[in-house]
Amino acid sequence: MLPRFADIFQQGNRWLNWLEKQPEGAVRPVVIESVTKIMACGTTLMGYTQWCCSSPDCCHTKKVCFRCKSRSCPHCGVKAGAQWIQYLLSLVPDCPWQHIVFTLPCQYWSLVFHNRWLLAEISRIAADVILEICHQADVEPGIFTVIHTWGRDQQWHPHIHLSTTAGGVTSGHTWKNLHFYARKVMSMWRYRITRLLSRKYPDLVMPDALAAEGSSKREWNRFLDTHYRRGWNVNVSRVMDNATHVAVYFGSYLKKPPVPVSRLEHYAGQDEIGLRYNSHRTKREEYLLMSGDEFMERFSWHVADKGFRMVRYYGFLSPAKRRLLEEVVYIITETVRKTAMQITWRGMYQRLLKVDP
């Protein structure tokens, strides 16, 4: 039996029909590879193990098919998210944390779409803002960022989720608490992004929507200055008391694939696909109805480039400073190290369905 999510691509040859309509080279190879894996996920095409009854009088066998492990697969994403939570629980120190969401003006979204390398740059800038505030206070924080390209309605909406310790370790190896405020963080973020886009002007591929604004360096800087004068949305959470809340709550939210199966409906044998989502604007659950072609297009936007790291670590959580984390931070925060539990498909099956696959 095919996985439920694969039905979207296979029923009525939705995926192949959409792919044939696209101009040559318009669909990134990684998108084709991801969808191919998703369609084969959980089938014998991915390989399988076969279990046989040990009794010589019984011919009963059972095949357990392998999963695709694609980052865009919602089925495999459940396991990947659960494993990442375990990794976070074993890594982050037990101290206060804050979560910050860095967004861009909507006029910049298409620019990032046509210059996907900017995603890594804006992740680094978000971390640099927090690092600069902390270094001014003689503090080394622990930071991790998660790059998201989708909004709740699956539109293209690049933004950065950043979790940081609400403080950090000083040069004297003591702990110092800090609180981050939206106004200061926003102004630093806005300045650095504007400076980046001005400096990288020669390297940018201008989308059609910004053809006039990007016609010359002078026009481009004028466009950037217009948006620099406006307020940008940077959301800073309240301080959370411990690392467990950070790992479990944000781990389950941030690591999930773009399209959760639980929010999809109304697509069995029909061309229309329904998506339930909680609207930021109305604060209510809304329902979006998409054609098969529209769903394929939106899905293709959010497939990460091969080898691109969606999660990044900075400060004493960065690999280069793990020694500081292990020899100083765990001690002064009195963190009891946890061992990451290994998540397996068999264990998840047994916990959720009470059946040994």
Predicted segments — roles?
Residues M1-P357:
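Beta->alpha loop/short-helix hinge microenvironment recognizer with preference
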